[in-house]
Amino acid sequence: MKKLPILLVALLLALPAAAGELEGVTLPDQVTVSGRDLVLNGLGLREATVLMVNVYVAGLYVEAKSSDPAAILNAEKAKQLVMRFVRSVGKEKLAEAWTEGFDKNAGDKRAALAGGLAKLNAAMTDVKKEDLITLTYLPDTGVTVSVKGKDAAVIPGDDFQRVLFSIWLGANPPNVSLREGLLGRAPKN
């Protein structure tokens, strides 16, 4: 009888880590960034608005789950957005999307953040199906932009991260279902 609890613990430790899945893309339920454990808050699908073409699956990682976009945006805590592309996208289209997202969400901070946006756009390269773009915010560093597994830029500033993450979590996301999924509100496929 005393061996049963030990056996149960051993079995639980042997189970694979849980993961989130959407549209055939699987992301881990937890990541560690600079010694900080982040949990998957939610997954969302970016659809091109005109033809409803799937572009990427995004996963939002935060220190503590929340369905409140303002709480996530205003928290000076580590967060990460991972985009796994489900189709090829050229660097010019990526830069256009970043610029449009800033235009829709930056408000009166747009001019002050132009340098950071230019740095973000310059970090882009053409991406293919299954490529990753990862945006990681650490309060003492800023946003690290990683494209295809390589760090491409570091952009300091809490204002920059707030506007950047508001592209997905703010009032004007590319598509509402993407924001709702990242906030853990949308049903997963």
Language-model segments: which ranges?
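N-terminal signal peptide c-region/cleavage motif recognized by signal peptidases
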Residues: 14-16
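Flexible glycine-rich active-site/ligand-binding loops centered on an Asp-His dyad
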Residues: 152-178
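A short, compositionally biased
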Residues: 24-27, 137-141
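Mid-length scaffold segments of soluble, non-membrane domains
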Residues: 63-140
